[in-house]
Amino acid sequence: MPKTSILALSFAVAASSLIAVPDARAQSCGQLWYERNSIYKAAGYCFRTPRAISAFGNAGCTYDSEYDVPLSPWQRRRVADIRAMEREFGCPR
């Protein structure tokens, strides 16, 4: 295989691995909203807004207050990071 082909293949593999890593900053407000609320849904939160109820439903929900939802330290950190990005990007509340 010629050197240029090997170099091109190496670059393509490296570039594809970079693209495969989710870049949170490239996410849209909608994607951030969905990811944040997916964390709450998985933990049993009962949604109040029509948008969230439409997207996730309330079947099987247990917790009316987001502060009562049992999240792991990683999940709490991720929710805090998402909220910070939503503020930074000026996402609607």
Regions found by a protein language model. Give the residues of each.
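Bacterial N-terminal signal peptides that target proteins for export
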Residues: 1-10
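Post-signal/leader-peptide non-cytosolic segments of secretory proteins
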Residues: 24-93
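C-terminal segment of classical bacterial N-terminal signal peptides
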Residues: 8, 14-23
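Residue-level signal for pocket-adjacent positions within structured domains
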Residues: 13-14, 42
